[in-house]
Structure formats: structure tokens, C-alpha cells
Amino acid sequence: MKTPASSRLLVAGYYGFGNLGDEMILASLLAIARRLWPGCSVHALSGDPEQTAALHGVTATSWTDLPGTVRAVAAADLVLLGGGGLFHDYWGVSPGDLLSPRQSGISYYAGVVALARLLDKRVGLWSLGVGPLLTPEGRELTAAVFREAEYAAVRDAASL
């Protein structure tokens, strides 16, 4: 995915929630982004923006701050979701909850992608885990997200 060196990246994943695996995923995503696009600036959506900023050297907005999320997406050149198991519907899926803190799964992350596309932003999906998808709504919403992405990579064969 070609992008200018001055790019502004927005990353969204399960960051800032105290899960070491997700923090390592963000650290590796940042290392790759900074190597590919030296000089890029990175902003993250996070459960704990202060912690995410301190740990990773990025700016961050709370994932529950809808106006802040809109500003972050609007300011980005590229919106990256991932990695990790963001697309599952263990607790159901509600398309009416797009971008809502009531849903931290498919509905929330699909909302980030929908907002990005409404604002004509590029979308990439990086090292995502997909599934289980137990509901037709979960499968349809996940497929819609993947159709909107310019680039998509999953973390394992089970996610294909």
C-alpha cells in the first residue's frame, strides 16, 4: 500500500485495555508503518489513550469519544484496523450500534470503516482474526468491511 512519507495514519484495534498481546500487535504494526513510511504520524483509538500514548509514542483518542473519533478519521490519510480478533460476534451484532461503545466487536469496527469511507479515506485491514461469525448479520457486516478495504490481511487460515 503506497502512501506518502508525510502520511497521517489512524490505527484502531483493541488497544489500551490491558491486553499484552494487543499491545504487542500495535507495537509491531507501528514498527512496520514507521519503516515503510518514515516520518508518518500515528494516532490510535484506545481504551486508555494516555497509556497508549505513553507506551507507543503516538497520539490517541478514547474509543468512546465519538466527536474525537470523527476528528481522528477526518485528519487521517489512511485508517488501519488490526490486528487481532476484532471480527467476531460472540455477543451478537447490531448494525444499529455502529461506532457505539455498546459494542466493541464488529459493530464498532465496522463503524470506523463506514466513517472512513464516508469521509473518502483509504482503509487497510492488518493481521485480523475473523470469527467465529455465528450470525448472518455478523457475516454480512464483516464482508462489507472487507469489501471497503483497499488492503486486507488476515492472521491465519481460519480467518479466510
Pin down the residues of each PLM region.
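Aromatic- and Gly/Pro-rich donor/ligand-binding loops
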Residues: 1-134
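A conserved, positively charged/aromatic
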Residues: 140-149
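Distinct, well-ordered alpha-helical segments
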Residues: 134-140
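A short beta-strand/loop micro-motif in the catalytic core of glycosyltransferases
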Residues: 149-156
